[in-house]
Design a protein with these regions (language model features):
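Hydrophobic anchor at the beta1->P-loop junction of P-loop NTPases
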Residues: 6
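Walker A/P-loop
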Residues: 15
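Conserved substrate/cofactor phosphate-moiety recognition/catalytic segment
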Residues: 18-66
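Glycine-rich phosphate-binding loop used to anchor ATP phosphates in small-molecule kinases
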Residues: 56-101
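Conserved phosphate-donor/acceptor-positioning beta-strand/loop module used by diverse small-molecule
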Residues: 100-121
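Small-molecule kinase domains that catalyze NTP-dependent phosphoryl transfer to phosphate-bearing small molecules
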Residues: 122-143
Length: 143
């Protein structure tokens, strides 16, 4: 079993890249963090705050850990592909460090700020102002 983490800012194309990878690897499983967020829709004001502000999303990160653990225990796939923005130390500690005993590959996607703004503005069902103002500024290029 191995985990492939597809990381990057809002609108960078994590889901598209992950879907392509899953098609190329036999017995790979795609675990979409966006779908998990739908499964655990906000039911209280504090949950809604967490959905809007990633720093408050600890309950979603914990739910993702549970989903990953369940898939690993069930078996049936040799590779788990997870597109998710690992945006803070809590995410990294719970997800990357928490599965340190499993072979992992971590890819960080980047793009020019102008391209990110175009992608975000062209996406439906997204919080455009939030993505443009917060995440596009946080786009980091690692050299």
């Amino acid at each position: 079993m191995k985990i492939i983490w597809i990381d990057g800012t809002f609108g960078i194309g994590k889901s598209a890249v992950a879907a392509t990878i899953v098609k190329k690897i036999p017995q790979a499983h795609l675990l979409e963090f966006d779908a998990l967020q739908e499964k655990y829709k906000p039911t209280s004001d504090s949950d809604r705050f967490g959905k809007r502000y990633p720093e408050a999303k600890k309950y979603l990160v914990d739910a993702l850990v549970d989903e990953i653990t369940e898939i690993i225990q069930e078996g049936g796939c040799n590779c788990l592909v997870i597109p998710v923005a690992l945006i803070n130390d809590y995410c990294n500690q719970k997800l990357i460090d928490g599965f340190a005993n499993i072979e992992s590959h971590h890819f960080i996607l980047t793009a020019k700020t102008e391209i990110l703004h175009q992608r975000i503005n062209n996406q439906e069902n997204r919080d455009i102002r939030f993505g443009s103002n917060l995440y596009a500024r946080g786009n980091t290029v690692f050299k």
